[in-house]
C-alpha cells in the first residue's frame, strides 16, 4: 500500500500576464525558489550571528560580501556542473543549452565548486586563509541543501527507486510504481542531520580546516548512502554496474574530508 504524493502546486502565486514589446510574460513565485530563498535568509541570519560573536574577526559587511559571491558561485557553478556532469551530450549538440535555466537543472557538486571559487576570492580580498572562510561557511550550507530538497519533493522530481517499503510514494512523473521518497531522505540527512553534526563539531574543535573536512565527510557519506535508493539519472545509468554519478563525485569528498580532519595540527 503506497502513500499518495500530496500533489502540491509547485507555483505559489502567478503575476500577470504582462505584455511587453509584443511578448507575453507571466512571472510566478514557485515553491522551489521560495525554499531556496528561505534557506538563504536563514543562512544569512546565522552567519551574521557568527560574525557578531567572532570578537571582531568578521563584520556584517564582510559577511554580506561573502554571501553575494557565494550566491553567484552556487548559481553559476550549479548550472555549469549540471550541464557538464549530467547533460554534456546536450551541451555538445547545442552549447546554448547551458543558458536554458528555465528548463531547470542544478548540480550540488557544481555548486560546491562555484562556492569554493567564491571563497578563494573572498579569502584573497579579505586577506584570510581559505579555510578561515570555509570553516565559517560550512556549518550553514546544510540549510540551503535541506531547503532545496524540500523544493525537489514539492516539484515531484528526483524521486527514488521502486520499492515496497510502507512509506513508498507514487510520484506523478515516476510512473505507477511506488518509489522511495529519496528527496525526504536527503532533507533529513544532508539538511537536518548534517547541520546538527556540524553545529556540534564546530563547538568542539579549533583545528583549521576540520569543520570544512567534517562537512565534506558527512555530506559525501550521506550522499553515497541515499544514492543507493535514489533513481539513477536515465541518461547516465550506473557506472561499472553499481555506481551513480552522484556517488562517483562524492567519494573524493569523503577522502579529502578525512584528510582535513586527521592531518597533523597546524599543517596548512
Curated annotation (Swiss-Prot):
EC number per UniProt: 2.5.1.145
Main location: membrane
A GO CC term assigned to this protein in UniProt: plasma membrane
GO MF annotation, one: phosphatidylglycerol-prolipoprotein diacylglyceryl transferase activity
UniProt xrefs under Pfam families: LGT (PF01790)
UniProt topology in membrane: Multi-pass membrane protein
GO biological process, one term: lipoprotein biosynthetic process
Top-tier EC class: transferase
Annotated compartments: Cell inner membrane
PROSITE patterns associated with the record: LGT
The protein's annotated pathway: Protein modification; lipoprotein biosynthesis (diacylglyceryl transfer)
InterPro entries in the cross-refs: Lgt
Residues the record lists as binding a 1,2-diacyl-sn-glycero-3-phospho-(1'-sn-glycerol): 149
Record keyword Signal present: no
Keywords, comma-separated and alphabetical: Cell inner membrane, Cell membrane, Membrane, Transferase, Transmembrane, Transmembrane helix
Transmembrane segments: 27-47, 66-86, 104-124, 130-150, 181-201, 208-228, 242-262
PANTHER family, alphabetized: PHOSPHATIDYLGLYCEROL--PROLIPOPROTEIN DIACYLGLYCERYL TRANSFERASE, PROLIPOPROTEIN DIACYLGLYCERYL TRANSFERASE
Homology family: Belongs to the Lgt family.
Role of this protein: Catalyzes the transfer of the diacylglyceryl group from phosphatidylglycerol to the sulfhydryl group of the N-terminal cysteine of a prolipoprotein, the first step in the formation of mature lipoproteins.
Protein name (Swiss-Prot/TrEMBL): Phosphatidylglycerol--prolipoprotein diacylglyceryl transferase
